[in-house]
Amino acid sequence: NVAMNLRSLGMHVTCLGCIGEDKWGNKLISILNEKKISTKYIEQKKNHITTLKQRVYCNNKQQSRVDHEAILDNWIPKNAVKYSDYDLVILSDYNKGVFSKKWFEPSCNDFVILDPKTLKKHLLSSVNIITPNLNELSILSAQELNSDQSIIRAAQKLLLEYSLDYILVTRGEDGLLVIGKNDFVKYIDPNPVESPDVTGAGDTVVSVFSTLYLTTNDIIYSASVANKAAAKVVAKKGTSVVDLEDLKSFL
């Protein structure tokens, strides 16, 4: 979904990861090729299944989700990637084993964003910006989050510990919270949506934010537009992407 959003926004995209040599893996490769998203760093592995998510809806609202998956064990990419060839690297950690081993080694001038799931210190120490939701921030910081101040304290702890530039905390109906060095804190007000379907909202935030921050270097502007884009997406059923026309309407 991140790759589809980036491509829809006009970015040239290359995917890296591991999927199964199966029906759904072949389907994924076909979809990505159709969208002109490079798959040269996607490994199709025998005896591994491609993750499949089945969502159960009732009255246009998601009630549950069934995941068919297998966790990779100590996977590393077969082909070395020169990350400096890319303007931006986004790491989407779904905790399926892709990042269980330390193989990602960016150079000091790379722009890297992590959408985290669990605490992986080797990843946190390799990135500039992370985009956790409240539950993920609580896990990463090992702190209970029950107020704005507790959220800020947890984020500031991670900023110092891993030398991060910024943390964008996605808070659903409460909007975004941008936290940076030197006690920088900025609240991004929510855009209320009636009966939202939050599927893919985090993917939209990281995609739109990354695209804009890469071109403007304006953290607040980029986060504000990303927040508006997420509101548009959650107003629809299931996953959807934003495109350049959508982006213009948010500016």
Which positions does each model-derived feature cover?
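Short acidic, glycine-rich surface-loop motifs adjacent to enzyme active sites
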Residues: 86-98
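Residue-level signal for inorganic ion chemistry
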Residues: 6, 89, 129-133
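Conserved N-terminal subdomain of the carbohydrate kinase-like
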Residues: 2-88, 105, 241-251
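Residues that scaffold the ATP/ADP-binding catalytic core of kinase and kinase-like folds
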Residues: 66, 140-141, 179, 233, ...
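Conserved post-catalytic alpha-helical subdomain immediately downstream of the catalytic base
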Residues: 161, 165, 191-250
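Hydrophobic residues at beta-strand termini and immediately following loops
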Residues: 66, 187-188
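Conserved phosphate/ATP/ADP-binding segment of small-molecule kinases
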Residues: 96-185
